[in-house]
Structures are given as C-alpha cells and as structure tokens.
UniProtKB/Swiss-Prot annotation:
Gene3D superfamilies: DnaJ domain, HscB, C-terminal domain
Alphabetical list of InterPro entries matching this protein: DnaJ_domain (IPR001623), HscB (IPR004640), HscB_C_sf (IPR036386), HscB_oligo_C (IPR009073), J_dom_sf (IPR036869)
Native source species: Buchnera aphidicola subsp. Schizaphis graminum (strain Sg)
Protein name: Co-chaperone protein HscB
GO MF term list: ATPase activator activity; protein-folding chaperone binding
Reported function: Co-chaperone involved in the maturation of iron-sulfur cluster-containing proteins. Seems to help targeting proteins to be folded toward HscA.
Alphabetic keyword roster: Chaperone
Amino acid sequence: MDYFALFNLPKKYIIDKFLLSKNFYKLQLKFHPDLFIHHSESKKRIVLQKSIEINKGYKILQDSLNRAIHLLFLNGFKISKEKVLSEDNSFLKKYFFLYEELDFLLKNNCDEVQIDIFFKKIRNKIDNYEKIIEIKFNEKKWDDIIKLITKLLFFKKIQTRLKQS
C-alpha cells in the first residue's frame, strides 16, 4: 500500500504534516465505521478494513522513521538492521556507550538537569540524522539512507526509553 497516494501527498521524506492531517480527517469522514452501522455486514467489513488502513498509514507518515522506511519500501528496498550493523562496529560501540550512560543516569537517580542534557544530546543526534536522510533521499542514495535509518532507529529507542522514565 502506498500511503503517500492514499493521503494525496508527494512521495518525499519531508511532508506537509498539516496537509496529512487534513487529508486524514477527510478520509475518516468518508470511511468511519460508525457512518455505516445500517449497511450490510460485508460493507461494514470493507469500511472497517479501509479505516484500519487509513489509521495505519497516518501513523506511518506522521513518524519520520516509519515514513523513511515506507519510502524505501516503495522504492524496492527493505532494511535489514543486522546486516547494516554488522558492517559498522564503531557505531555499535558508540550506541552501547550511550545506552550505558542512560542506564547510569536512570539507575543512579540523577537530577533532572543531567537527564535533560542527555535528552537534548540524543534529540540533536536524531535531528542531524533526519537532516542527512532528507538530503540522501533527494539524491536517491539508497544504501546511505538504509545505514542512516538503522542508526536513527537506535537513537529513537534511546529517546523512547528516556520518555518512559
């Protein structure tokens, strides 16, 4: 499924999120299951499936990492984290060092300032990777994008863990 086509958006890494939301709500108004309660069971199933597809597509396009993975998929590529990471041991070492730093901060009840500094460091790394990914998409440098997305995934995991703490 091409979610860019579903939401009538250009197939680009950077999207107009306002337009995405606007088109999402238009589709929801058209395919919301509650609007079909008096229709046949088969029609209800079709509409429910379409609604699920719309919600899934919206979530994918809202998130920069998932949007990048979807764009790669549409261009015939699939990410294999294991293959990419096995080729870049230096990144894995840096990542594990950051994860150890995060564990230390969380286990030692460090103050909010230290955690905030670490969070900003991770946010900056994510922002930098996203900017580079945008450039690489424009250049159609698929192999570079795959490597960058795999690294971005790790920083997003650290960010998620920080937000949950």
